[in-house]
Amino acid sequence: DVLTKILLELNDSLEKAATEQNALLRSFDALQSIPNNMRLVASRLEPSGGPVSAISENYKASSVGISDRLRSFVGGEGNLCEQMSREVAHALFLLGAERVLKEMIQTGDREPTPADIDWEVERKLLEQVRRECTAKACTALTSGVEVAAALSRSSADIRRQMLGLDTIRVLGRVECGRMREQGGGLSAAIDQLDTFHDDIKGRLAALMGLSETISAGMVSYLRLAA
């Protein structure tokens, strides 16, 4: 049915979000070594404190700030991705339990009851637990919607901060042009930055899209199940 389809899609989106989260952290960790390579290149191309050295230092400082922010929502204990996954997983479990309890009640209403079981008492208990599962699932889904929105906002903020790194990267490319005869090592480092920047921005966009999809799925379920 429609509700089952929504649950399956939510679970699929959560798995994709976890994959993007892990890949994003790996890309950003790999990115941290490039400013060090730029400094090594600078030591061969210019006196201490030259433009390439300044570019590498500025890039390093900016990327560390972004890395700290990134880990606050996709890395470390209690991050936003983990919170969203936990709330949705909790809701999915409760919703599954609710559906099983509902089927048990329907089966009990249809089938003959053993003489040693008071079905009316059992039915009331099952119905009470079913309602509790529904209420707790709705609470978890509502919380999940809020966390998904926070994750989407944080992803957008990181993408904006990446524009600052893009500016520094462009300055590095300008220096490559100025040192075209001797800046081969610098050019290779900037090429690596190009690759990682594209990858990171793409994964941030994917996380934003997935968090919005998850949020929309939870809202749809709450509306249809009401």
Place the predicted regions along the sequence by residue:
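Acidic, heptad-repeat coiled-coil helices used for dimerization/signal transmission
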Residues: 1-226
